[in-house]
C-alpha cells in the first residue's frame, strides 16, 4: 500500500544481514500477536520507522515464529525493544515506554 510504510518484518533468517551487518542504527521490537502490551508499542515502532526512514533501520521480530535471536539476546519478556549499532546491543527497553524513550534511543546514535 503506497504511503503506508510498515516496520520491517525481521526473521531469524534475515536477522544477521538486516540487524548485525547494518551500517545504520537498528531498533528491533520483539513482540507476539497475543501480547497485549505489544499492541501499545507496535504503533510507536511503525511511526518511528516512517520518521527515521533512511537514517535508521526499524523492525519487528515475532518471537513465536522466530525464537533464535530472542533467546540469544535474552529476551524473556515482551515487548522488548533492543537497539543495535555496529552489531552490538547498545540499548534495551523491556515493557511499554513513552514514544520519546524510543525516539531518543535512535536520536542518540544519529
Feature annotation, model-predicted:
Residues 11, 31, 57-59:
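Conserved Rossmann-like nucleotide-binding pocket used by diverse enzymes
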Residues 83-110:
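Non-catalytic, surface beta->alpha helical segment in thiol-disulfide oxidoreductase systems
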